Amino acid sequence: MNVSERLAASAVVPVIVLDDAKDAVATARALLAGGVDVMEITFRTAAAEDSIRAVAEECGEMVVGAGTVVTLEQCRRAVDAGAQFIVSPGYDDEVVAWCVEHDVTIVPGCVTPTEIMAAMKRGLSVLKFFPAGVYGGL
């Protein structure tokens, strides 16, 4: 299965915030022990890049992605660290184009018809309804 298929097959994609990269592998192993083989590590802390790298190197069966990616530089750093997919809170055409060009699964946050159409134009079929709460979601 490719990354998109693994994401689709997963009942849940835990969004993980790690303040210390030393906790990354233990967190990934706990998820794997519980039957979860996909995780998104947010780029909201300084430990994100090292956390992704540690999981990618130590837990090969885990599909690890980077979340809260808002710049192309973060995207590149995440992929270089071993992220297999990227999640962003909004649609950034530069990030999306780079991911498409480099065959990296990208899940941008989209809520407006304009954002959804831009994503479809880039060939994306999986989007994140975000921010859901603002638009009546849970």
Regions found by a protein language model. Give the residues of each.
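Conserved anion-binding
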Residues: 47, 70-73, 79-138
